[in-house]
Amino acid sequence: MSINNEKAIVVFSGGQDSTTCLFWTKKRFKEVIAVSFDYNQKHKLELECAKEICSKYNIEHHILDLGLLNQLAPNSLTRTDIKVDKNAPEDGVPNSFVDGRNMLFLTFVAVFAKQRGISHIITGVSQSDFSGYPDCRDVFIKSLNVTLNLAMDYEFVLHTPLMWIDKAETWKMAYDFGVLDIIKNETLTCYNGIKGNGCGECPSCKLRKKGYLKFKELYMK
């Protein structure tokens, strides 16, 4: 695999998907920068996970303040008075959905990237396992890519390595990169803020575990 000599920025939460994307990016770009967001999330330990992973692998890391999002979009990830849905509702999106989150994350990262002369931005969204979140869809990413290019008169390229793969294949990607244990033990995907295997009860933990078991069944025989 040839290495792109350009720089790239990863939208990095410290969770399974974005950490997998971080290593995907390290395989493809000469220099990688990680950007995380503090939006008053209850599972703020994910930011500590992000710091630790970046420190361990000598990756430049920035945390941007997006606390205003908590005031604008009530949801179970930022409000202590709202419990996380254990199961996705039949109609509508789960209460863990944060309106505008991915749009704002990618927009702020794009502003950050342009100031540094960087075009490539990587995000871990997936339409295969998107839990009903509209801002994880491929059509949204493609639309935003065009909008950002027009808004800033700049040629951004939004990469979505996980867009069309499920959690089992995401685990397989980590295995192929030699970072399976890091993803399994050092990331935080749980909506209740528990590192590694998580609480086992929230939708994120259930999806992660289901994917891991499928990965073991398909690829670890």
Curated annotation (Swiss-Prot):
Query: Any signal peptide, and if so, which residues?
Result: none
Residues where Zn(2+) binds: C190, C199, C202, C205
Q: Mind listing the GO molecular function terms for this protein?
A: ATP binding; ligase activity, forming carbon-nitrogen bonds; zinc ion binding
- Binding-site residues, ATP: F12, S13, G14, G15, Q16, D17, S18, T19, T20, C21, L22
Reactions this protein catalyses: 7-carboxy-7-deazaguanine + NH4(+) + ATP = 7-cyano-7-deazaguanine + ADP + phosphate + H2O + H(+)
Q: What Pfam families does its record include? A: QueC
Gene3D superfamilies, A to Z: HUPs (3.40.50.620)
Q: Which InterPro entries match?
A: QueC, Rossmann-like_a/b/a_fold
Q: Which GO terms describe its biological process?
A: queuosine biosynthetic process
Provide this UniProt record's keywords sorted from A to Z.
ATP-binding, Ligase, Metal-binding, Nucleotide-binding, Queuosine biosynthesis, Zinc
The record's cofactor note says: Binds 1 zinc ion per subunit.
EC number annotated for this UniProt entry: 6.3.4.20
Q: Does the keyword Aminoacyl-tRNA synthetase apply?
A: no
Entries under NCBIfam families matching the protein: 7-cyano-7-deazaguanine synthase QueC
Q: Which family does it belong to?
A: Belongs to the QueC family.
Q: How does it assemble?
A: Homodimer.
Protein role: Catalyzes the ATP-dependent conversion of 7-carboxy-7-deazaguanine (CDG) to 7-cyano-7-deazaguanine (preQ(0)).
Recorded protein name is 7-cyano-7-deazaguanine synthase
